[in-house]
Amino acid sequence: MKFSEKWLRSWANPQVSHDELVARLSMVGLEVDADLPVAGAFSGVVVGEVLSTEQHPDADKLRVCQVSNGSETFQVVCGAPNVRAGLKIPFAMIGAELPDDFKIKKAKLRGVESFGMLCSAKELQISEENAGLLELPADAPVGQDVRTYLELADYTIEVGLTPNRGDCLSLAGLAREVSAIYDVPLAPVAVDAVAAQHDETRPVELAAPAACPRYLGRVIRNVDLSRPTPLWMVERLRRSDIRSIDPVVDVTNYVMIELGQPMHAFDLAEINGGVRVRMAEDGEKLVLLDGQEITLRADTLVIADHQRALAIAGVMGGEHSGVSDSTRDLFLEAAFFDTIALAGKARSYGLHTDSSHRFERGVDSQLARKAMERATRLILDIVGGEPGPIVEQVSEAHLPKVAPITLRAERVTQMLGMPLDAAEIVRLLQALELTVVADGEGQWSVGVPSHRFDISLEVDLIEELARLYGYNRLPVRYPQARLAPNNKPEARAALPLLRRLLVARGYQEAITFSFIDPALFELFDPGTQPLTLANPISADMAAMRSSLWPGLVKALQHNLNRQQSRVRLFESGLRFVGQLEGLKQEAMLAGAICGKRLPEGWANGRDGVDFFDAKADVEAVLASAGALGDFSFVPGEHPALHPGQTARIEREGRLVGYLGALHPELAKKLDLEQPVFLFELLLAEVVDGHLPKFRELSRFPEVRRDLALLVDQDVPAQDILTQIRAAAGEWLTDLRLFDVYHGKGIDPHRKSLAVGLTWQHPSRTLNDDEVNSTTQNIVTSLEERFNATLRK
């Protein structure tokens, strides 16, 4: 909620400084996100009047103007497209200082002298409008200081409200808070009933009373929309971050900001028959005020006539029934819509308006008539017209009702940590316009006004007491708790350890959204139905991820597009598998690498990463819990990975993850030119390991044998190593694959695997006969199982 401080002080004016007011608002829960001057720092700028203009003799786009400051006439060269005789504008005379220390001096533009400058709103930092000069009203007093005339000694304050405080989405609500905080009088705007000048009405039917229990309408005839919106209203709207459109729309927006009641005005000539508040027909079409055509769903509340929908209730009006320059008669609407009925509807159509923002958070159910009278009076004052009687339809059974709440003094003491005086409790609650009636010793019955729809429980009342009394005045008491010993198994590798390990290996941690673009989901997990959000932040964040890879690859792509040629990212987080029925949320650890193997340097940084670099990182992660031997890498398939560079990561036969190169077709669709390698692991399987087993270092020599084995191309090296370990006996201390060869001198259907085996006995020296016998057993077992032979 953004508003003018000067406007707020016209309702409730505590004798405190701007800074103190801002600080106090934040302290009572109305957190101030921003407070800025309404204009830049400038001086020497007055209201000027352009008396005449003529073409510059040496520039097509410049005009030579004669400008009056009320006492003298000055020649000013101006290039603004809207400069014309009779226009009143901000005139910066010689010696004036504009924002950013820009001083106005006598100048010569293309040979013509200029004695000052005519200013746009942007040049004075009043707004971002820069299409031409800031046009002032025709009755602006020539010669008056612009800061005085526009009342620029003001601040715009923006408060970030929690969803339950919809009552503060208006000047009236904020003024009530300020009045209560500082115990100063509240001076609301006077709203009197406007007498009808004719009998014309339009019948109103509530076909969906649960969604719209109250609807008011009024016909106003013979309005003149050629009249401008007065400057005071335009300025108050601008300082509330609302652009002036036309007098009628400006009035409805003004009343919304002032009182908190969203309103809408229809062109009466476009309403066929009466007004029906109903649910939309499934598939019904409506062109909105912003020009987009939408297809309505049956769960959407609409304002309609007897032929078609006119507006999405509480969200946006339709284009064909909207007010235009040719409108002469209005149908003015004010209604109360149920919060639940409108919740999420705007977002479901890709919309968000000031009206929907308020109705979704709650609007005073008793406010509509007051807002109707206020808007009617403003419209009559600005564009004239003849008002008719108000037509109101109400379903009392569906209006919200709040029963009195019992407040106990002992409960207040218990929750605040200190007693509050009974008189103080009554004073604070009455300051918020709550009715308080004593109901026994230390107990009250509290009535809640219709605008405080966030208060329904005793704890809500106690929260209000704490806010107004001051959180900073409550006693500080530290919580007392028993510290329990850490029962985490010693064999468990915690996630922080894995994070540090990957960082040490050159990775950087990424955090990406759990919801992704459905199109990206389909690329990584084709054929799987994603779990979609009913009310996503945006259309490209509508699917819950079934893998961490989509977010990681997008982050990697983002870095590559910003001249980062070597990228190594990892992420830990949840993936979501299945639909709501039987949904699995699994903690995962994933990584993505591309670019050079090592940072650029004189002795390295030339070779790119490959499959085995990613595999080495995965092995380091798996080894962190001391259970690397439980895992194996098995050739596999995954739709997002290269068909020839994909490994299933298994733990004792259970699938725990995947490792591989990004599929070339997927890389092409994502415009990734460099090879990208990915891994993803089930975190629960990775962190559970084994305690290390300690044994005495052997004092006896090691014995090593190297074997060059010829096997078929399709035999995984992992299977060979597993078989060797099984046949090598208990004294095998190290086994390494140090070479893979296929080419000249080798059958094209075979490959050569060179492995090194190291044995060491803890209490004696192994002799050659023992080692040779074991080696022969290994060769025999490999020959029997894999048709392996020694390379000669």
UniProtKB/Swiss-Prot annotation:
One of its GO terms (cellular component) is phenylalanine-tRNA ligase complex. One of its GO terms (molecular function) is magnesium ion binding. InterPro entries: aa-tRNA-synth_II/BPL/LPL, B3/B4_tRNA-bd, DNA-bd_dom_put_sf, Fdx_antiC-bd, Fdx_antiC-bd_sf, NA-bd_OB-fold, Phe-tRNA-ligase_IIc_bsu, Phe-tRNA-ligase_IIc_bsu_bact. Keywords: Aminoacyl-tRNA synthetase, ATP-binding, Cytoplasm, Ligase, Magnesium, Metal-binding, Nucleotide-binding, Protein biosynthesis, RNA-binding, tRNA-binding. Residues 39-147 form the tRNA-binding domain. SMART domains: B3_4 (SM00873), B5 (SM00874), FDX-ACB (SM00896). It is found in: Cytoplasm. Transmembrane segments: none annotated. GO terms for biological process: phenylalanyl-tRNA aminoacylation. Residues 400-476 form the B5 domain. Binds 2 magnesium ions per tetramer. It catalyses: tRNA(Phe) + L-phenylalanine + ATP = L-phenylalanyl-tRNA(Phe) + AMP + diphosphate + H(+). Mg(2+) binds at residues 454, 460, 463-464. Residues 698-791 form the FDX-ACB domain. CDD domains: PheRS_beta_core, tRNA_bind_bactPheRS. Its EC number is 6.1.1.20. Gene3D superfamilies: 3.30.56.10, Bira Bifunctional Protein, Domain 2 (3.30.930.10), Ferrodoxin-fold anticodon-binding domain (3.30.70.380), Nucleic acid-binding proteins (2.40.50.140), Phenylalanyl-trna Synthetase, Chain B, domain 3 (3.50.40.10). HAMAP family: Phe_tRNA_synth_beta1. Tetramer of two alpha and two beta subunits. PANTHER family: PHENYLALANINE--TRNA LIGASE BETA SUBUNIT, PHENYLALANYL-TRNA SYNTHETASE BETA CHAIN AND LEUCINE-RICH REPEAT-CONTAINING PROTEIN 47. Belongs to the phenylalanyl-tRNA synthetase beta subunit family. Type 1 subfamily. This is Phenylalanine--tRNA ligase beta subunit. It comes from Pseudomonas aeruginosa (strain ATCC 15692 / DSM 22644 / CIP 104116 / JCM 14847 / LMG 12228 / 1C / PRS 101 / PAO1). The gene is pheT.
